[in-house]
Regions:
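Conserved, structured core segments of small domains
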Residues: 1-108
């Protein structure tokens, strides 16, 4: 699905729309106990994915209900696999991710 930045007739010439994925991943009830020992590995991986351009933005909601990420990927399945591979998922910090296509405004 990620087609890269697109030019559309109704979009100004100095703006492009990039299709990416907005991902919401709820924290489990056990997350406060499990998260600290996994956090270093998780943050190291997220930082690497940001440097590689796969993850655009990532962070947790202040009320500790979920994490929100913007991810570049071709398909929803690819996004969900990326989340499944994270230590927060295998370690019981995250569960039940959802991914939706998202039009990101990119100035040229």
């Amino acid at each position: 699905m990620n087609t890269g930045p697109q030019s559309l007739p109704e979009v100004p010439e100095d703006v492009q729309i990039e299709t990416v994925w907005v991902v919401e991943v709820p924290y489990t009830p056990e997350a406060p106990e499990r998260r600290p020992k996994l956090r270093r590995a998780h943050l190291t991986r997220i930082a690497r994915l940001i440097r590689e351009g796969v993850v655009i933005e990532a962070g947790g909601v202040a009320d500790f209900s979920k994490a929100v990420l913007l991810i570049r990927a071709n398909t929803e399945a690819e996004v969900l696999a990326l989340i499944a591979e994270d230590v927060y998922t295998s370690g019981g910090v995250w569960h039940s991710p959802t991914a939706r296509a998202y039009g990101r405004v990119v100035p040229r």
